[in-house]
From Swiss-Prot:
Belongs to the universal ribosomal protein uS7 family. GO terms for biological process: translation. One of the primary rRNA binding proteins, it binds directly to 16S rRNA where it nucleates assembly of the head domain of the 30S subunit. Pfam families: Ribosomal_S7 (PF00177). This is Small ribosomal subunit protein uS7c. Keywords: Chloroplast, Plastid, Ribonucleoprotein, Ribosomal protein, RNA-binding, rRNA-binding. NCBIfam families: rpsG_bact (TIGR01029). Part of the 30S ribosomal subunit. InterPro entries: Ribosomal_uS7, Ribosomal_uS7_bac/org-type, Ribosomal_uS7_CS, Ribosomal_uS7_dom, Ribosomal_uS7_dom_sf. It comes from Chlorella vulgaris. It comes from the Eukaryota.
Amino acid sequence: MSRRRTQKKRIVMPDPVYDSRLVELLVRQLMREGKKSLAYRICYESMNRVADATQQDPLVIVEQAIRNATPLVEVKARRIGGSTYQVPLEVASERGTALAIRWILSVCRKKTGRPMAAKLTAELLDAAKNSGLAVRKRDEIHKMADANKAFAKYRF
């Protein structure tokens, strides 16, 4: 076991426009090379496009998209007696949210040919409808955890 003290959780202040911690987490994951103002611009432009496309509050759509992409279980490799098992574990709510945001943004970054705001808009709308690549990734993780349910006894 580690002898260090456990690190305190950092408090995430809400973003200035929507007053939402979730949007701030999205912006922080979106940021590259310390360019936070660019990340804000991309995020807010994407949310404006979501509002135009759905005629609804974009914050509700973003929350729905992240909720649909959030995994409930994940698998972790555990080495026992010379063989490695994929052990299914429940995901804490903060980690689940972080994974969902990360998956949505990684799907956006893999696509090419359009501005990031357009790609983020498309993926958020897809995830809100319970489709899209981020939701498919969550389903794959759930299937893998279900297939390895027998190894749940080796939980950490």
